[in-house]
């Protein structure tokens, strides 16, 4: 079993405070035998986006700066992968980024949120350039991992392109209320792509967050179970904590080889309209960015 620690923890009031609290949470994850520790969205500053551009820049950290390097050193020390999330320094605007660090302390990739919430505070941020998938070395062997962040979940293309790039597991830092419809989105993304999706949210009482971090394993059917099984194999409550979700990679890989979803029977030649950037009513929004 691959053990994923969902660090559903309240942020501190400072970047240094988040560094220390995050290190403590990672140590607890390791004590619980985790292979991967996943943080909520923009952990470095607790998902705080000031409306003043200069103040926002002061909150940002570099992808190769001390904040991230401390977690790289910690990953090496603990022999545990860490998916750390940051408000990343970038010009002309900061990025909402997640950096996957392997258990050897090396950065595997850096993903910056593509579907920024331009209708809200994230209009102060730049959006990312691409989706990335890479092999992550774990005690269970290599696993193909990709990342999407919070609002990315609401677009089927996010999980789909990660699946097409070979992802078996999607890591999702999150900062919003996880209610029935958003949880249903994650369930659907896992089901339709035959991928596992681990999501880590902030707990209550952080404003506009309510915990309910989850792991969906994407396996809807098993020979030994009649009908369809629940792909949600773990769901936390609203409280702060370090929660361990277990993923059966052997079962997932067998299922992906045999079932009919994912890329098995797609007809991409019929989907040309999906890359047409023309927007028509009722979907025209003045604050939309390309």
Per-segment meaning from a language model:
Residues 1-5:
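Extreme N-terminal starter segment of soluble prokaryotic enzymes
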Residues 8-15:
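Short polar catalytic/cofactor-binding loops
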Residues 15-16, 24-104, 108-110, 176-193:
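Cys-nucleophile CN-hydrolase/nitrilase-fold catalytic domain and related Cys-dependent amidase chemistry
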Residues 89-165, 173-174, 178-188, 195, ...:
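Active-site catalytic loop in hydrolytic enzyme cores
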Residues 133, 203-290:
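C-terminal beta-strand edge segments of enzyme domains
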């Amino acid at each position: 079993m691959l053990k994923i620690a969902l660090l559903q923890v309240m942020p501190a009031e400072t970047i240094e405070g988040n560094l220390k609290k995050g290190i403590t949470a990672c140590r607890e994850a390791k004590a619980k035998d985790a292979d991967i520790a996943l943080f909520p969205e923009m952990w470095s500053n607790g998902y705080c986006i000031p409306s003043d551009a200069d103040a926002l820049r002061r909150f940002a950290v570099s992808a190769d700066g001390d904040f991230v390097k401390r977690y790289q050193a910690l990953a090496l020390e603990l022999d545990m992968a860490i998916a750390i999330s940051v408000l990343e320094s970038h010009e002309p605007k900061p990025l909402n980024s997640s950096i996957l660090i392997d258990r050897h302390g090396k950065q595997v990739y850096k993903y910056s949120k593509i579907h920024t919430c331009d209708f809200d505070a994230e209009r102060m941020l730049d959006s990312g350039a691409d989706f990335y998938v890479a092999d992550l070395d774990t005690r269970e062997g290599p696993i193909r991992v990709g990342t999407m962040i919070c609002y990315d979940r609401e677009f089927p293309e996010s999980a789909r392109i990660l699946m097409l790039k070979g992802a078996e597991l999607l890591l999702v830092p999150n900062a919003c209320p996880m209610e029935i419809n958003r949880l249903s989105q994650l369930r659907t993304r896992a089901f339709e792509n035959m991928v596992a999706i681990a999501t880590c949210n902030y707990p209550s009482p952080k404003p506009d967050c309510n915990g309910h971090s989850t792991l969906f394993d994407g396996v809807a059917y098993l020979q030994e179970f009649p009908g369809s099984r629940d792909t949600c194999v773990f769901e936390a409550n609203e409280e702060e904590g370090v929660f361990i979700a277990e993923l059966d990679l052997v079962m997932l890989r067998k299922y992906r080889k045999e079932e009919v979803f994912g890329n098995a029977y797609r007809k991409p030649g019929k989907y040309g309209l999906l890359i047409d950037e023309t927007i028509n009513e009722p979907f025209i929004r003045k604050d939309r960015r390309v």
